[in-house]
From Swiss-Prot:
Keywords, comma-separated and alphabetical: Cobalt, Cobalt transport, Disease variant, Disulfide bond, Glycoprotein, Ion transport, Phosphoprotein, Secreted, Signal, Transport
Involvement in disease: Hereditary intrinsic factor deficiency: Autosomal recessive disorder characterized by megaloblastic anemia.
One Pfam family cited in the UniProt record for this chain: Cobalamin_bind
Annotated source species: Homo sapiens
Gene: CBLIF
Tissues in which the UniProt entry reports expression: Gastric mucosa.
The name this protein goes by in its record: Cobalamin binding intrinsic factor
GO BP terms in the entry: cobalamin transport; cobalt ion transport
Predominant location category: secreted
Gene Ontology molecular functions: cargo receptor ligand activity; cobalamin binding; molecular carrier activity
Length: 417
């Protein structure tokens, strides 16, 4: 899915005692392991006292085996200190799993989430698929803590999924698969067989839809939704009719890593577990070892040293034509920046040259997101946001990650999702 859709999920968020293991064909070749270790180090180094405390990163660190114990301890402390009132059900679910994977007691977070999910209902019968992402995380977290108490919640959630007819979303489908697989594997002995039948039916439906998103090159949806989809396809008790070539997917992801596509810490957190042979179902089985630093094996051939960068010109347009919004505009500016600069630098230079291009950002688990341009701000209630496009193609990276090329036309379009 497009980068913004992943960010949107962050706004809305956000086995029965046995360890799971991805299929052997998914194993990363030993020669490529330093490549995977390299992105893990990059992810762990993003953890600082001033950074957004991201539970997905802590889960990935613990499932993979953390290298940077100081970062691990800092992030654990930050999440333990988080205010439950500031968290959505998805964020609360992730935080519970992150603390569980750190062998820490989540305290009252579990009972709070339990109560919230008992009162949960979608906003409408055909709510967007992304509206089910946070509840999927919540059910997965609750399943790992008390599956029996979670059963009525999961049954209602599964029936709601069956009745929903909104367009399919790979990330949401993958997370729902993990949640319902946990419930399927933990149905109490002596319970009605109808529970297993219901969960199996929903899982079969979702997994078939995920399999329809597998591209010829192995990518599932897009490169940033592939990590969660790999987890889902590797553990589901209801495999799809279409065979999944896990090796092809793994090889393609490794190739994307070589090309530098995985440098955003959140994108690394979502792909790392699968590359390490783990899934979110392994969270309760993480063994917390005594404190000792582990030095990873990293790639031995560093890239070429820095060279003096030439300037490039980026054509930048801001556009708002939404009815009901007072200020309508379509303005274009040519901006000169150093080659290799991220899009954020382009926006800053445009703002310096013309106050009409003034913008504001918000920090999320996926990094900086542009929340306002020319005093027109996104609004969750109105489902409006600033979408960035290259030509007519939505960008799949954020402004702090995307690197524009010479004479590229970037448009920031105020639109609705």
């Amino acid at each position: 899915m497009a980068w913004f859709a992943l960010y949107l999920l962050s706004l809305l968020w956000a086995t029965a005692g046995t360890s799971t293991q991805t299929q052997s064909s998914c194993s990363v070749p030993s020669a490529q392991e330093p490549l995977v270790n390299g992105i893990q180090v990059l992810m762990e180094n993003s953890v600082t006292s001033s950074a957004y405390p991201n539970p997905s990163i802590l889960i990935a660190m613990n499932l993979a085996g953390a290298y940077n114990l100081k970062a691990q301890k800092l992030l654990t402390y930050q999440l333990m200190s988080s205010d439950n009132n500031d968290l959505t059900i998805g964020q609360l679910g992730l935080t519970i799993m992150a603390l569980t994977s750190s062998c820490r007691d989540p305290g009252d977070k579990v009972s709070i989430l339990q109560r919230q999910m008992e009162n949960w209902a979608p906003s409408s019968p055909n709510a967007e698929a992304s509206a089910f992402y946070g509840p999927s995380l919540a059910i997965l977290a609750l399943c790992q803590k008390n599956s029996e108490a979670t059963l009525p919640i999961a049954v209602r959630f599964a029936k709601t999924l069956l009745a929903n007819s909104s367009p399919f979303n790979v990330d949401t489908g993958a997370m729902a698969t993990l949640a319902l697989t946990c419930m399927y594997n933990k149905i109490p002995v002596g319970s009605e067989e109808g529970y297993r039948s219901l969960f199996g039916q929903v899982l079969k439906d979702i997994v078939e839809k995920i399999s329809m998103k597998i591209k010829d090159n192995g990518i599932i949806g897009d490169i940033y939704s592939t990590g969660l989809a790999m987890q889902a396809l590797s553990v589901t008790p209801e495999p799809s009719k279409k065979e999944w070539n896990c090796k092809k997917t793994t090889d393609m992801i490794l190739n994307e890593i070589k090309q530098g596509k995985f440098h955003n810490p959140m994108s690394i957190a979502q792909i790392l577990p699968s590359l390490k042979g783990k899934t979110y179902l392994d969270v309760p089985q993480v063994t917390c070892s005594p404190d000792h630093e582990v030095q990873p094996t990293l790639p031995s051939n560093p890239g070429p040293g820095p060279t003096s960068a030439s300037n490039i010109t980026v054509i930048y347009t801001i556009n708002n034509q939404l009815r009901g919004v007072e200020l309508l505009f379509n303005e274009t500016i040519n901006v000169s920046v150093k080659s290799g600069s991220v899009l954020l630098v382009v926006l800053e230079e445009a703002q310096r040259k013309n106050p009409m291009f003034k913008f504001e950002t918000t920090m999320t688990s996926w990094g900086l997101v542009v929340s306002s341009i020319n005093n027109i701000a996104e609004n969750v209630n109105h489902k409006t946001y600033w979408q960035f496009l290259s030509g007519v193609t939505p960008l799949n990276e954020g402004v702090a990650d995307y690197i524009p090329f010479n004479h590229e036309h970037i448009t920031a379009n105020f639109t609705q999702y």
